[in-house]
UniProtKB/Swiss-Prot annotation:
It comes from Azobacteroides pseudotrichonymphae genomovar. CFP2. NCBIfam families: PRK08881.1. The lineage of its organism: Bacteria, Pseudomonadati, Bacteroidota, Bacteroidia, Bacteroidales. Belongs to the universal ribosomal protein uS14 family. Keywords: Ribonucleoprotein, Ribosomal protein, RNA-binding, rRNA-binding. This is Small ribosomal subunit protein uS14. Disulfide bonds: none annotated. InterPro entries: Ribosomal_uS14, Ribosomal_uS14_bac/plastid, Ribosomal_uS14_CS, Ribosomal_uS14_sf. GO terms for biological process: translation. SUPFAM superfamilies: Glucocorticoid receptor-like (DNA-binding domain). Binds 16S rRNA, required for the assembly of 30S particles and may also be responsible for determining the conformation of the 16S rRNA at the A site. GO terms for cellular component: cytoplasm; small ribosomal subunit. GO terms for molecular function: rRNA binding; structural constituent of ribosome. Part of the 30S ribosomal subunit. Contacts proteins S3 and S10. The keyword Phosphoprotein does not apply.
Amino acid sequence: MAKESMKARELKRARLVAKYVDKRVRLKKEGNYDSLQALPKNASPVRLHNRCRITGRSKGYIRQFGISRIQLREMASMGLVPGVRKASW
């Protein structure tokens, strides 16, 4: 499980990206790269990293569900993920 500080840092970055998204698009369209460079580093969407919503785990993230593979397996076996069931053939 990720530290609470890591989860908080990612959340803070996501908020910063959302705050500057319109300004970033406008500056790119104008070609004003000096002003674009002056924006905060964490306002860049490239710096975001996908994390499990439950545990904060960064590896094994499954985008479709927004959780890690481990949590998906546990939740699917308990029947908490609609439409997902154990394969049998």
